[in-house]
Amino acid sequence: MSCQGTVSPKGARKLHDADVVYLYDGSFEGFLCCVYESFAQHELPFAVWTPQRETATLYPVKDIATDPAVARRVFASFGKKLGAETEYLVSRDFLSGQEDKELLLLRFLHLAFALGPGTVKREGHPVVAPLYAMKKSLDWEVDKFQGFVRFEEHDGMLGAVIHPKNYILPLLRPHFCGRFPEEDFMIYDAVHQAVLLHEGHKTQLLELAAPLELPPPSAREQQFQALWTQFYKTLEIKARHNEKGRMTPVSYTHLRAHETSL
C-alpha cells in the first residue's frame, strides 16, 4: 500500500504503512476514533473494516473502540484546523458505499493536516481526487432518488423500497420530510438495511437487524397502479415508443399531484 501524496510536517514523525487492520463498528463516531488511532500511531492501516466487511487476514486486527468524547474532539479539529469545507466533505463522503472509503478519508486527512485548509481545493491531487469522486456519486444518487421514489400505500402509510449504492437516507430526509410533512411514510433502504420513518410529524432513521418485507399493496395502491397504466397509454406516442424508457422508474410523487385530474 502506498501513502502517495501524504507528507509529514517538519519535525513530526513520518507516517508509515502499517501491517494492521482496523476493525470498528461502522458508525461515524467509530470512524473518527480510527482517525485518532491513525494519527496517534502515525500509521496508515492496511485496511479498515466493519464487522460486515470482516474477512480472514494474515494481518493482526486492531479493535478500535468507539469513544464519543474522542470522536467529538477529532471532529471539532476538522472545522478548527481544516475549515468548514473539509468538515462537510469528510462527513458527506462517509456516507459513500465505496468499500475503501475509510482509507481514502484517512489518507486525505493526513495530507490535509500536514498542508492546511487549502488542501481540500486541490481536486487534481491523487489523494484528494477520490473524495470528489465519492461526492459526485453521492450527489448524483441523491438527485436521482429525490425525483424517482416509487411509493405504495400500506394501511394508511406510504412505503417505498430503494436500492442505492450509497447510504443516502440521511441526505434524502430533508427533501421528503419537506415535501410530505403531513403524510406518514417510510423509505426502506434494502441495501443498507435502514429505514427513514416519518410518522406523526416525527422522523427517525433506523438501522435494522434483519431485512424488512413490506406487506402487499392495498386496494387503493392497486387502483393507483391501474391509473398509471391508463395515464401512460393515454400519453404514449407510438412513433416514439421506447420500451427501455418505459422501464425507467416513474415519479409517483409527481403523478399523485395529477391523480384527481385524470
Question: PLM features: residue spans?
Answer:
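N-terminal ordered "arm"
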Residues: 3, 7-68
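Conserved small/polar residues in nucleotide/adenosyl-binding loops
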Residues: 253-260
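A recognition module on extended beta-rich or small alphabeta surfaces enriched in W/G with H and D/E
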Residues: 181-183, 187-250
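Charged, alpha-helical interface segments at or near domain boundaries
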Residues: 59-142
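Internal, well-folded beta-alpha domain core
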Residues: 118-208
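Short, hydrophobic/amphipathic alpha-helical patches that form generic packing surfaces
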Residues: 30-41, 106-114, 174-178, 226-233
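Glycine- and acidic
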Residues: 17-21, 158, 213
